[in-house]
Amino acid sequence: QLLLAAAALPGAACPPGGITRADLLALKRSKFEVASSDERNRLAVRLLGCLDDPDPAIRDGVVFEALSTWLRGKALSPPTIAALESSLRATLMGEKDGPGFRLPFAALVLSEVARADRIEPVFTEEIRAGLVEVAAASLMRVDDYRGFHPTEGWRHGVAHGADLVLQLALNPRVAAPGLRRLMEATATQIAPRGAVFYTFGEPERMARAVVFAYRRGLLDAAFWEAWFAGLASPKPLADWGAAFLQVEGLAKRHNTLAFLHALSFAGRAGGSDGDLTAVGD
């Protein structure tokens, strides 16, 4: 397992040794069919070296799609899933890369790992608690708000971080303290400081996570009242009227309203508590 994780650390070769880019694209065309279980499990971890590949056809179209396909198809072994979690956790809390691809895609793949653990538990309570902390801390440290670029593809750090929060919030083995930490972290990105205007669906992704954390019923009314009071506060503005006098204020107003609208829609569309698993899919 340690050797598997080491092979996936930042700086690992992309494509992995002995594999060409043409091989990776052929893997996608084959719908990620790898007959040998051992080969598939080794390749899964080695693909993490391509998380920051500048080509979206590789980064998104092969790496993410392959790992998502295998994880959802229960085609990876528990040791491999553990190695993925360990490597991705280290990546998320490691150095930021200039192009800005590595961390958002580490969060996105880790959301699939967290989903696998939610469906069939793999991790110990201690590892899962550590994953909650990494999800919260990594979301709070996002300061690259680039979304989609027509040639470079997606970055989408906040949305991918929210996807990870969602999977953990849905997990019945994540208790109230973990949910509280996840919601406090999410609140920091609903209306980030600066002239940041969300235009790539970030409010919707955060709203889904919040709705289903709320529906777990583990956080009391006092918590949610304080949480929404913080969201409704105009600070650092003197009042909401002041938002119209500066670009940063307009961004705060725009993002706060976008989140509240998304939250209202998610609350109506999400259905009953019995729909949690389907929505998490």
Stretches with model-predicted labels:
Residues Q1-P16:
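Bacterial Sec-dependent signal peptides at the C-terminal "C-region" and cleavage site
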Residues L9-P10, I58, R102, G157:
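Generic detector of short, well-ordered, non-transmembrane alpha-helical segments enriched
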Residues C14-E33:
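Short N-terminal segments immediately surrounding and downstream of signal-peptide cleavage
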Residues K28-A136, A213-P234, W240-A251, A269-D275:
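Alpha-helical solenoid scaffolds in large eukaryotic transport, assembly, and signaling factors
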Residues E85-L219:
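Eukaryote-skewed repeat-based solenoidal scaffolds used as protein-protein interaction platforms
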Residues R173-G267, G271:
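Long, repeat-rich segments with strong aromatic
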Residues T277-D281:
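C-terminal non-catalytic accessory extensions
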